[in-house]
Amino acid sequence: MDWDIIQNLSSNLVFGILLFAMTIYWISLSFFKWTKNLSQVGKISAIVANILLFFILGSRWIVAGYFPLSNLYESLLFLTWTLLTIYLYVEFKTKSKLVGAILIPVALLINGFANLTLSVDMQKSSPLVPALQSNWLMLHVSMMMLSYGTLIMGSLLCILFLVISKYQDIDLQILDESSLPLYNIMLDYYEAKLFSPSDEVSELGKLKLLQSLDNWSYRIIGLGFPFLTIGIIAGGVWANEAWGSYWSWDPKETWALITWIVFATYLHSRITKGWEGKKTAILGGLGFFVIWICYLGVNFLGKGLHSYGWLS
């Protein structure tokens, strides 16, 4: 049995399923009045894609004998799986089709980049070099990828907040309903837009939606930040074990520190300064781009310890 062929076919199937799910979610949002239950099809498709990704990662782990995070291809698959897992949890809690409409396209692009851009050789498992044969590898890289997945999602909600608010300062203290499920808020907003001629009613629904986006972005970023912190610390221990230095100002390390500072500033401004709305959404939105520079951008430089086994 050629596991490489099976894994490749499964990964391509994931791409097709995610493309289908994205189409379903966008149709469901575009024709909200007539397709209220259509998003369930998209959610089921995402669950199937997530199960397939779990199978791919699990089979690579069993066949190769090590945790499948040793190269760029495997990390992209793991990131896709992480994003889908977090999205499914949030959708289960909120019953919101909006979450799927913005997260599925990102997961699709990541999976497409892994399958359509990387060469066949880069997609194959290969024996680990001595520096990577460490238990710290699983902790460091898995924590970093979990942090990327959660922080990307939280950042996307921040960007969505800025788009819906049209980059305006919105007073979110007017309402005291931040704990409302996002699903109910989506219903308020879209039904007001579709059925009510009153601008006052539609603006109330919009305000509720913005309040919920602000609340959920804060929760998700608050979840991802500890993962990032643990990942950086574990990476330092691993580096000292492998190369005799906790920190070498490698480009990846530098950008990981920048990413940590951006999200630490976001959380600090919310917890101690009481910021919310536009100000924190800008910080969170900035974090989205910083994450991608840290994760992929510095790999194209071909410099530093992290360029080995990824993209050089």
Curated annotation (Swiss-Prot):
The coiled-coil segments of this chain are none
Q: Which residues cross the membrane?
A: 12-32, 47-67, 72-92, 98-118, 144-164, 220-240, 254-271, 281-301
Quick one: where is this thing mainly located?
plastid
Write out the GO biological process terms.
Answer: cytochrome complex assembly
Give a GO cellular-component term: chloroplast thylakoid membrane
Where it sits in the cell: the answer is: Plastid, Chloroplast thylakoid membrane
Sorted keywords for this record are: Chloroplast, Cytochrome c-type biogenesis, Membrane, Plastid, Thylakoid, Transmembrane, Transmembrane helix
**Keyword Transmembrane helix assigned:** yes
Q: Which GO terms describe its molecular function?
A: heme binding
* PANTHER family documented for this protein: CYTOCHROME B_B6 PROTEIN-RELATED, HEME EXPORTER PROTEIN C
| Subunit-level organization | May interact with Ccs1.
Per the record, the similarity remark reads: Belongs to the CcmF/CycK/Ccl1/NrfE/CcsA family.
Q: What is this protein called?
A: Cytochrome c biogenesis protein CcsA
Q: Which organism is it from?
A: Trieres chinensis (Marine centric diatom)
